[in-house]
């Protein structure tokens, strides 16, 4: 069986360095808020081209804390609206409602699955205060246009970069476009820890200072609490492991991009919709880092069964949109036909930096041999 993502083989590439990092942390006797965290925050800031990185416990906390910090600064308040695409993973919406804000779920661009600038503009009201573009599946959103729109309407922009590590437009990385960004380092991400981890990036010094406190019980100095904060700290061990893996992110990105190109050039089945036209991709390679390679078909269950029978593991990202989840039942009557069509048709096939040429060819052959009997 070709695994959807072989985390063991990915991390085995760096096992000596990862084990050295573990030993270094163990021997240091300092396990929370130490030099490993400082080093990773510094290196990740350099990687993203930003002034500040704030390590936190996970990607959801990253988004939640940015919105919370803007509330502390008086830039937003409970009841304000946040525009987000309706086909996102539920964490994007959870961060909004956790802060007493109102998610405005808008239809995505049917071709990119990302926020449509036209749909953002149509959704703006007097209560709109934030745009939350999710760079879904590894493709960065149309950030120059989104930032121009945000500037025109005086809106804040919070990038959800949980799936877009290393993506860029004109050399400017995801995480350096909006007023702030949230990253996840969940093990399956393109830059994955060996446990839960996350980070916030920003160029706003005032925002960063509040976030440094909010993640640590609302405190800059022990036992002096400025805010009603939380415990959301990126620990020393995960920071050390991430520092190792960050060095290789660029190479892994190129490998993913090469696999994606092989898929785009060679999967040819009228029953399967590919995520991009190959020429479109070749002209904008840096914009997609292929966290996921998501195809679409009206016959998803049959295709998934066919691929399984051919020894290929697949996953669905995502089977149920947020507005159809029980947690958000009050939104279930929303008319979002594009979103619902996407969730009914998408299927993710294997793409990972340790895939062999034989495995790639097998996936292509299996996709091309799919037929409706």
Segments (PLM) and residue ranges:
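N-terminal "arm"/small-domain region of PLP-dependent enzymes with the aminotransferase-like
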Residues: 1-30, 310
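PLP-dependent aminotransferase class I/II
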Residues: 8, 37-42, 47-54, 60, ...
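Pyridoxal 5′-phosphate
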Residues: 13, 76, 256
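Phosphate-binding glycine-rich loop
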Residues: 30, 34-81, 95-99, 105, ...
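PLP-dependent aminotransferase-like
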Residues: 71-136, 140-161, 168
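Hydrophobic/aromatic ligand-binding patch that stacks against planar heteroaromatic rings
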Residues: 95-96, 149, 173, 190, ...
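Conserved active-site segment immediately N-terminal to the catalytic lysine
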Residues: 159-194, 209, 221-226
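Short beta-strand-to-turn element immediately C-terminal to the catalytic PLP-Schiff-base lysine
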Residues: 183-184, 198-203, 243
């Amino acid at each position: 069986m070709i695994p959807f993502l072989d985390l063991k083989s990915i991390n085995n590439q760096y096992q000596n360095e990862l084990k050295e990092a573990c030993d270094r942390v163990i021997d240091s006797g300092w396990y929370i808020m130490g030099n490993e965290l400082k080093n990773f925050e510094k290196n990740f800031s350099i990687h993203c081209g930003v002034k500040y990185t704030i390590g936190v416990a996970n990607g959801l906390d990253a988004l939640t804390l940015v919105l919370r910090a803007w509330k502390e600064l008086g830039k937003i308040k409970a009841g304000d609206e946040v525009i987000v695409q309706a086909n996102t993973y539920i964490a994007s919406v959870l961060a909004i409602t956790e802060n007493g804000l109102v998610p405005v779920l808008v239809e995505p661009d049917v071709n990119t699955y990302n926020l449509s600038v036209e749909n953002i503009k149509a959704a703006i009201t007097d209560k709109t205060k934030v745009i939350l573009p999710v760079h879904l599946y590894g493709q960065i959103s149309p950030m120059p246009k989104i930032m121009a729109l945000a500037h025109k309407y005086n809106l804040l922009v919070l990038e959800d970069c949980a799936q877009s590590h290393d993506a860029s437009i004109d050399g400017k990385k995801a995480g350096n476009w909006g007023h702030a960004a949230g990253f996840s380092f969940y093990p399956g991400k393109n830059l994955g820890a060996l446990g839960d981890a996350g980070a916030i990036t920003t160029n706003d010094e005032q925002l960063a200072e509040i976030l440094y406190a909010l993640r640590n019980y609302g405190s800059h100095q022990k036992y002096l609490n400025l805010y009603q904060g939380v415990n959301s700290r990126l620990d020393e061990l995960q920071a050390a492991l991430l520092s190792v893996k960050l060095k290789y992110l660029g190479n892994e990105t190129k490998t993913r991009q090469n696999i994606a190109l092989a898929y785009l050039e060679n999967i040819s089945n009228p029953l399967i919709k590919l995520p991009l036209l190959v020429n479109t991709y070749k002209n904008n390679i840096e914009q997609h880092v292929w966290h996921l390679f998501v195809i679409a078909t009206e016959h998803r269950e049959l295709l998934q069964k066919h691929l399984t029978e051919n020894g290929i593991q697949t996953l669905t990202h995502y089977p149920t949109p947020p507005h159809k989840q029980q947690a958000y039942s009050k939104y279930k009557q929303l008319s979002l036909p594009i979103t619902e069509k996407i969730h009914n048709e998408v299927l993710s096939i294997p793409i990972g930096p340790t895939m062999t040429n034989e495995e790639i060819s097998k996936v292509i052959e299996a996709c091309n041999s799919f037929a409706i009997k």
